[in-house]
């Protein structure tokens, strides 16, 4: 689904939802926008000029992701160091089960090797070599480059070129010279195609991931940008005067003309994490477990002491890339997850594939004949057949019943409703185990608030919270558009990374240590200048730009480094060095405890970065006066039969839009809105606070 959330200057918001249209994402975007405008009562004729009222528009889409999934990007040629022509097909063992469930991870036959974006016949090796210190060992053979360029650009008619040489992150002269030769060949051939260099796209170690990053940029960035331009054009037709913005994987907003657009390839779930971080700053909770239930996947991340960790080598569509991304883990467990019976064991098998939003659950009668989790929600009475997406989508409960009986219940020899509840319990167990086993290892769950969002988040939140002793459990009425809302909570941000290797021994004198870290300072200064100039060119004023140097540090001999925002701008004295390494040690002991800290350890700086930010106006959470505990009459919609714990019960039904801050509700209940549904089991109690946030506690623990 495509969600649009409109936030006004008072912090009020409204959510619109529409089916995603992958062939032209502007269609789904505009339909969702118009639905939101209808909801707040903007007349049709005024909607055609509503763009004049928009200060900014931010789009977090899956254009680049879809391009890679569907293998519909540019025909890309690869020029690389001779002997490394197969680098596009190479990889690491663990990339064969990225995002898979544990059952797939533990069985080799389920593992899948991706199809390379660059086929072997479009890869050319050229003679050159730079060593690990940046020294030229073999000068580049320019005639090799010219021949490779001619074969790829002229003979093969490639639509883009990726250039990836060994050690180019230390010394980029060979890649830049190769690009000059390619442009000359391109000019002679009368063509104009993008040429991407790994030293510009991802100047960091991990050569296979660096190559993948450059190839994805060359393969998918321009096709994805065309989708973004379509959305911008549609907005301008209704009076929007600014440029469309998009979200980058590390939680920043940027112009859609941003050159390294591949950094936005994995931004689909970032909005939710950033929205959770902002929400936490308002309510005063900086330890949050974020859980997003969509149609296809269950995504989870952890905010620890207000910090969202960044993964510099995330998995992306069966490969690893060098692109900073907020840490988030996913499994194929959403409301559209397919339910099948394994013919060998006669057991229930959930996913990992999904109907998603198209063709959707069987009850939508759009061609899908495999039952999904949402069919279970409908059969059990949790979802209202007359209120699916506010009643805009036709639902046929009988179709859902018949297909579920035929394909799930009868093979199991179970009653339809018993089988449906069993499937729901299995899904909730999968979600709970995913959070506790992969996210909260080493953390005390009692210190964390569990936040549920996404269209299916409130629907499954309390069942997968289970008996785990979270500090609190909460959701929001705009959960269905929470990730979109999170986009409005982000600053405008760019960041640049560069690999380095600097070792600081505690026995060094101040002069020796300052001299050793001089390369760090030099790279910081260079990255600062690049980012500053980028933002100035985009129209920002110098006083708006905040630049933060970052160092990635570990103890010598250890495998994992930590991101340390530097409290100082340079490293010219012992005080500067102490400030940086003290910040590292504080972070290290916070994550791994004081007992893990080696005494007198040698520091190893493995990578440096600079983050450039421009603060934006954030949505404001309005404080309301608290009403009576009892919900108003217009919020109470009677009861509905609901199957729970092997029997039918009468559940209280409430209209979410009419509930007020201060209201309290006991389970068994269903609180439904047009874009989401909150299911409240019998053992839970709901309280709405002054910010209209829904807090859930087990009865007896209020």
Where are these regions (language model features)?
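Glycine-rich beta-strand-to-loop/alpha-helix junction loops that act as flexible
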Residues: 60, 164-167, 198-200, 249-250, ...
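Glycine-rich phosphate-binding loop of actin/hexokinase-like ATP-binding domains
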Residues: 4-7, 16-23, 27, 77-83, ...
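Terminal amphipathic helices with adjacent charged low-complexity linkers/tails
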Residues: 162-214, 218, 387-388, 566-568, ...
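Gly/Ser/Thr-rich loops at beta-strand to alpha-helix junctions
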Residues: 1-2, 59-64, 166-175, 270, ...
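N-terminal glycine/serine-rich phosphate-binding loop of ATP-dependent small-molecule kinases
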Residues: 1-77, 131, 138-161, 175-197, ...
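C-terminal, non-catalytic interaction/recognition modules in large multi-subunit enzymes and RNPs
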Residues: 143, 147-151, 155, 233, ...
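Conserved phosphate-binding loops in N-terminal lobes of ATP-dependent enzymes
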Residues: 1-5, 14-38, 65, 77, ...
């Amino acid at each position: 689904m495509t969600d649009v959330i409109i936030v006004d200057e008072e912090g009020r918001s409204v959510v619109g939802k529409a089916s995603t249209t992958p062939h032209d994402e502007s269609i789904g975007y505009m339909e969702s926008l118009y639905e939101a405008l209808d909801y707040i009562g903007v007349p049709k004729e005024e909607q055609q000029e509503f763009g004049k009222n928009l200060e900014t528009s931010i789009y977090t889409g899956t254009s680049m992701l879809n391009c890679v999934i569907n293998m519909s990007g540019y025909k890309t040629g690869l020029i690389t160091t001779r002997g490394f022509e197969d680098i596009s097909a190479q990889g690491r063992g663990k990339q064969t089960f990225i995002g898979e469930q544990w059952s797939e991870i533990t069985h080799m036959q389920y593992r899948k090797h991706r199809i390379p974006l660059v086929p072997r016949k479009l890869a050319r090796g050229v003679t050159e070599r730079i060593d690990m210190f940046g020294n030229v060992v073999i000068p580049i053979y320019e005639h090799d480059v010219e021949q490779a360029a001619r074969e790829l650009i002229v003979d093969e008619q490639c639509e883009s070129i990726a250039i990836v040489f060994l050690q180019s992150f230390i010394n980029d002269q060979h890649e830049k010279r190769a690009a000059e030769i390619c442009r000359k060949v391109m000019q002679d051939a009368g063509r104009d195609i993008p040429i991407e260099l790994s030293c510009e796209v991802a100047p960091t170690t991990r050569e296979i991931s660096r190559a993948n990053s450059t190839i994805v940029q060359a393969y998918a960035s321009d096709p994805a940008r065309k989708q973004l331009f379509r959305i911008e054009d549609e907005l301008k037709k209704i009076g929007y005067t600014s440029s469309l913005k998009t979200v980058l994987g590390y939680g920043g907003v940027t112009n859609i003309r941003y050159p390294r657009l591949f950094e936005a390839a994995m931004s689909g779930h970032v909005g939710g994490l950033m929205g959770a971080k902002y929400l936490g700053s308002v309510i005063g909770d900086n330890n949050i477990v974020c859980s997003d239930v969509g149609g296809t996947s269950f995504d989870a991340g952890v905010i620890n002491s207000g910090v969202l960790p960044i993964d510099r080598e995330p998995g992306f569509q069966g490969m690893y890339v060098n692109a900073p991304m907020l840490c988030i883990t996913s499994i194929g467990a959403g409301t559209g997850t397919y339910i099948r019976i394994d013919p060998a064991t006669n057991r229930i098998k959930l996913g990992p594939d999904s109907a998603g939003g198209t063709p959707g659950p069987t009850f939508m009668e759009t061609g899908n004949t495999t039952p999904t989790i949402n069919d279970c929600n409908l059969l059990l009475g949790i979802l209202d057949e007359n209120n699916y997406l506010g009643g805009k989508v036709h639902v046929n409960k009988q179709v859902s019943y018949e297909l579920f009986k035929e394909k799930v219940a009868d093979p199991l020899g179970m009653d339809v409703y018993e089988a449906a509840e069993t499937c729901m319990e299995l899904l909730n167990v999968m979600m709970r185990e995913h959070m506790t086993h992969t996210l909260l290892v080493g953390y005390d769950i009692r210190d964390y608030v569990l936040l549920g969002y996404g269209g299916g988040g409130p629907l499954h939140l309390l069942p997968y919270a289970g008996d785990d002793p979270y500090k609190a459990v909460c959701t929001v009425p705009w959960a269905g558009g929470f990730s979109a809302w999170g986009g409005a909570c982000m600053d405008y941000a760019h960041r640049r990374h560069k690999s380095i290797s600097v070792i600081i021994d505690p026995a060094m004198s101040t002069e020796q240590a300052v001299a050793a870290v001089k390369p760090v300072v030099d790279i910081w200064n260079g990255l600062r200048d690049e980012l500053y100039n980028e933002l100035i060119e985009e129209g920002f004023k110098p006083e708006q730009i905040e630049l933060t140097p970052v160092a990635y540090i570990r103890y010598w001999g250890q495998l994992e480094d930590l991101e340390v925002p530097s409290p100082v701008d340079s490293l010219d004295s012992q005080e500067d060095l102490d400030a940086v390494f003290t910040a590292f040690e504080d972070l290290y002991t916070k994550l791994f405890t004081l007992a893990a800290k080696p005494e007198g350890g040698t520091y190893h700086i493995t990578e440096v970065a600079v983050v450039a930010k421009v603060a934006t106006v954030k949505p404001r959470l309005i404080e309301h006066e608290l009403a009576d505990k009892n919900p108003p009459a217009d919020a109470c919609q009677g009861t509905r039969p609901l199957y729970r714990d092997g029997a039918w019960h009468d559940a209280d039904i409430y209209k979410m839009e009419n509930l007020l801050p201060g209201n309290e509700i006991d389970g068994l209940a269903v609180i439904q809105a047009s874009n989401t549904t909150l299911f409240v089991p019998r053992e839970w109690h709901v309280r709405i606070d002054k910010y209209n946030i829904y807090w859930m506690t087990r009865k007896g623990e209020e």
